[in-house]
């Protein structure tokens, strides 16, 4: 690990609706320990000395963002949320370009509903990728036995988990490379579920940086309940 961490921009796509949560609002605005998941996710970055700024992609008709304490923070800019995650991230990168960010600047993209990022994991990612020619992402080696299912919901095969990792965020890439990769995927109608998959499609191999398994993304109600119990010291 290097002694000096590289400066970086953070991008948080926050325009999704989180349908699987079946909540009365988008999941990034659900509360955990007195503030929203989005605010917790922002907290992971705003106290970091290497941060240059943050762009949050927000849905056009979002009624919740203006009421957050970070809505008027000068370190945070907003971008228009898009139909898909890739659109939202690409719009955020355009905002960074407009602010004078260069193609060689590092950008870290983080899920709005992933509030439990440890500072040690963030520093590890920055340190290990500082001189990497491609960039990479936090990830966790698969622990459970993995099964491939057929169309009838029955096991068709057991997957060798020795080379399988779960992709987490932040995902860290150079602004120019990520912009080109996402733009090319959108033009080619390639579906990408994260930034690393866009970089992969462009022919590059992102590096996997092992992180903590408790850096979970809130996707279902039980995820939020687990975090509430953990943060309350009950787990």
Swiss-Prot record:
It catalyses: 2-C-methyl-D-erythritol 4-phosphate + CTP + H(+) = 4-CDP-2-C-methyl-D-erythritol + diphosphate. Keywords: Isoprene biosynthesis, Nucleotidyltransferase, Transferase. The keyword Protein transport does not apply. Pathway: Isoprenoid biosynthesis; isopentenyl diphosphate biosynthesis via DXP pathway; isopentenyl diphosphate from 1-deoxy-D-xylulose 5-phosphate: step 2/6. Its EC number is 2.7.7.60. GO terms for molecular function: 2-C-methyl-D-erythritol 4-phosphate cytidylyltransferase activity. Pfam families: IspD. The record marks 161, 217 as: Positions MEP for the nucleophilic attack. The record marks 20, 27 as: Transition state stabilizer. One of its GO terms (biological process) is isopentenyl diphosphate biosynthetic process, methylerythritol 4-phosphate pathway. It comes from the Bacteria. It is an enzyme of class 2 (transferase). Transmembrane segments: none annotated. The keyword Nucleotidyltransferase applies. Catalyzes the formation of 4-diphosphocytidyl-2-C-methyl-D-erythritol from CTP and 2-C-methyl-D-erythritol 4-phosphate (MEP). Belongs to the IspD/TarI cytidylyltransferase family. IspD subfamily. This is 2-C-methyl-D-erythritol 4-phosphate cytidylyltransferase.
């Amino acid at each position: 690990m290097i002694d000096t961490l590289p400066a970086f921009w953070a991008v948080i796509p926050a325009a999704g609706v989180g349908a699987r949560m079946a909540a009365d609002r988008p999941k990034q605005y659900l509360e955990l320990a007195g503030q929203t998941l989005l605010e917790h996710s922002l907290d992971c970055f705003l106290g970091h000395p290497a941060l240059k700024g943050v762009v949050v992609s927000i849905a056009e008709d979002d009624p919740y963002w203006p009421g957050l304490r970070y809505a008027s923070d000068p370190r945070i800019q907003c971008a228009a949320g898009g139909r898909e995650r890739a659109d939202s991230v690409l719009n955020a990168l355009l905002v960074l370009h407009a602010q004078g960010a260069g193609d060689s600047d590092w950008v870290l993209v983080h899920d709005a509903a992933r509030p439990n990022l440890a500072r040690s994991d963030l520093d590890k990612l920055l340190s290990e990728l500082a001189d990497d020619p491609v960039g990479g992402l936090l990830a966790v080696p698969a622990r459970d036995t993995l099964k491939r299912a057929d169309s009838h919901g029955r096991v068709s095969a057991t997957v060798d988990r020795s080379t399988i990792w779960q992709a987490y965020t932040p995902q860290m890439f150079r602004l120019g490379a990520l912009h080109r990769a996402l733009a090319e995927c959108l033009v080619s109608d390639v579906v990408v579920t994260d930034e690393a998959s866009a970089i992969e499609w462009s022919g590059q191999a992102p590096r996997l940086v092992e992180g903590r398994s408790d850096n979970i993304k809130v996707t279902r109600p039980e995820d939020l309940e687990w975090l509430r119990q953990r943060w309350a010291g009950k787990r």
